[in-house]
Structures are given as C-alpha cells and as structure tokens.
Amino acid sequence: MSTSTKRCYYETLEVERDADESKLKSSFRKLAMKFHPDRNPGDDTSEVKFKEINEAYEVLKDKDKRAAYDRFGHAAFEQGGPGGGAGFGAGFASSFSDIFEDLFGMAGQRGRGGRERGADLRYNMEITLEEAFGGKTAQIEIPVSVTCEACSGIGAKAGTKPKTCSTCGGAGRVRQSQGFFTLERTCPGCQGRGQMIEDACPSCSGQGRVTRERTLSVNIPQGVEDGTRIRLAGEGEAGVRGGPPGDLYIFLSLAQHQFFQRDGADLHCRVPISMVTAALGGEFEVPTIEKGKAKVKVPAGTQSNRRFRIASKGMPVLRSRQTGDMYVQVVVETPQNLTKKQQELLAEFEKLSSGNTQPESEGFFTKVKDFFGSRAN
C-alpha cells in the first residue's frame, strides 16, 4: 500500500493526536478484539483492518517512531525516507504476542504434549430433613471418564510413544509472517496438542481415558441447607493425555417434610388444639427433629395462630456449634358434628358469655354499632 492511500494512524486507532499511552493501548485492544481474524473467519476485510490496526499501534506506541510519524507522516518509514530502514521486525512480533496472549488466551489451557484438565462434573442429590440434621455418609455411583490403564493416559498404543509435532515443534501453535505482520494460530497439524499419535491406543481411541462406573463416598455434614454444594477435588473426569482430573460437585436438595418447615436454622410446625384447651389452658407434646418429644404449655385464653418457641430444638448451623429454635403455632379447631347435648351446652355457654370472656368479639361488635350509629346521625 502506497503512502498516498494509507489512512492516518490516529484515525485507524480512533484516537486524537494528543492521546496518551493508556488511551492508545485501550483503543488498540478494543479494535483488535473486534477485527481479530479468529473472531471473523473468512472475512478478508477484517483481516486487512486488523493488520492496519497493528501497524498503527506499532508506530504510535514507540516514542521515536511516533515523533517521526508526526513530522514526516508515512514517508518516515519508507526505505530511504527520513526514518526508513527500521521496518517492523521482532519488536512488533513480541508486542503482538504479549498483548494477544492476554486478550485471546493464546497461552491456552493445554500443557505441552496436549495435556488437558478434565471436565468438572455435577451430581444432584436429594436428602431428608433428618439427614440434614444429623449428617450422613452417602454412597453414590456415577459414570466418569478415568485414565485409560492400557496406555496410562498417554493415548498411544502400548509399546509406542507420541511423537513431537513436526509442524510446531511441540509448541501447539504456529506463527505466520506476512511482511511486518505476524499472526499466531493453533497448529493445524496437531490441533494444539504439540504431539502426534501415529498408533492410537485401541482401548481409548487415543483419548487417554475411558468411561467407567465409579462408587464414591460423600460426607454430608450436619446443618446443610437446600442448594448446599459439596466439592470433591479430583473426582471429576480424567484429564486428556495425562492432564489433571476435574472436580465433582454435589448439589444438595432437601425433600419436603411432612411436619416441619425450615427457615434457616429454625423449624416451624402447626399443631391443632381443641377449643376447650385454648380456653382453659393445657399441655401437649410435639415431636422434635432428633426424634424426641417436647412439651408445650398452653395458657388459658390462647388464641388461634399463637406461636410458642422451644429453644435449641431447631437445626444445627453448618460448621458451627449453634443450633436454631423450634416454633410451634397452635390452630384452634372449631368443633364439628356436635351431638344435640353438645349443641345445647354451647348455646347455654353463649348466653352466659360476656365481654370479659370474649373481649375481641365484644370490642368488634361495639365498633360496628358505633359505626352504623354515626352514619344514622
């Protein structure tokens, strides 16, 4: 491209002429990510734009080159020009490599020899409230990828070894130079592994791992809650070609309980009581989560939905010595299917009742009477 058709380097990087180093680098990163060939496969326009961006940044990030460009323009870098002869050599390649390994992860997740960390696995487990209270050790069976014993995870047939890729020299990546521009890509020969397996292991088809059923012991501590996650390090899928294994994550869910509702470390339950017990007072027993019993004393005149607290009868707090409380909510039942004698007794009780025995009802009807009386006036 001749100097007469080249765009201004500042326009190419979309910055002002007085832009400082941080603004240059920020704009360069943004544009480079946008037009990088790996993100725009087959787009020749993006590749040309990407080269222009790198050329502009290579000049403007260097104080001496920038000063020469500001004075002479593109002519400063033509052969025989005021600043010619330097070209874009190793300095550009180094800058490109440093920046784009950071931007696009060119260092990769693979180690030398194509070793890759195994995938993490998830296992969903439902437990009861009683199990969450006391803790338990559970046995689970899961299908996982394990290291192939036939090839010891290498992927090559027994008696053979992988060979270093001749294309990349075992690096897993290759560099392609186009004049001043150097682009680093995944090696097409070994697909980034750095090694070539000419005779694959028949047991694992060269993957270095096979699928097996594995039985694991899972320790569930006291006080776990719905959604608690337990990590078993190294119990995920085996790594590829000798890479480290992934982890296994156990996600716990609590089954609905027939009697208790849980709120953090506290437990709640509803217990029906008779109208007589509510009026005269009494005592009853309720089951506790540890399979015991607790007594609840009901004072005379107890109203429906009143709650009673039983200290330290709730759930243990995970990884703590603290324990929640248990709350018992009483529900006063209205009697049904009364005999004639029972109906007569209740009717007699109603005649004998006064504002002292039913203060809320008396107060309510007094308010209603006052309301309609005020409207009549």
UniProtKB/Swiss-Prot annotation:
Keyword Chaperone: yes
This protein's record includes keyword Metal-binding: yes
Biological process, per Gene Ontology: chaperone cofactor-dependent protein refolding; DNA replication; protein refolding; response to heat
GO MF, any single term: ATP binding
Binding site for Zn(2+) 1: 148, 151, 201, 204
Cofactor(s) needed for function: Zn(2+)
Residues the record lists as binding Zn(2+) 2: 165, 168, 187, 190
Zn-finger segments (CR-type): 135-213
A Pfam family annotated for this UniProt entry: DnaJ_C
GO cellular component: cytoplasm
Note accompanying the cofactor annotation: Binds 2 Zn(2+) ions per monomer.
Domain J: from-to ranges: 8-73
CXXCXGXG motif repeat copies, ranges: 148-155, 165-172, 187-194, 201-208
Record localization: Cytoplasm
Entry keywords, A to Z: Chaperone, Cytoplasm, DNA replication, Metal-binding, Repeat, Stress response, Zinc, Zinc-finger
Complex and partners: Homodimer.
Domain remark in the UniProt entry: The J domain is necessary and sufficient to stimulate DnaK ATPase activity. Zinc center 1 plays an important role in the autonomous, DnaK-independent chaperone activity of DnaJ. Zinc center 2 is essential for interaction with DnaK and for DnaJ activity.
HAMAP family the record matches: DnaJ
Family named by the database record: Belongs to the DnaJ family.
Function statement: Participates actively in the response to hyperosmotic and heat shock by preventing the aggregation of stress-denatured proteins and by disaggregating proteins, also in an autonomous, DnaK-independent fashion. Unfolded proteins bind initially to DnaJ; upon interaction with the DnaJ-bound protein, DnaK hydrolyzes its bound ATP, resulting in the formation of a stable complex. GrpE releases ADP from DnaK; ATP binding to DnaK triggers the release of the substrate protein, thus completing the reaction cycle.
Protein name: Chaperone protein DnaJ
Gene: dnaJ
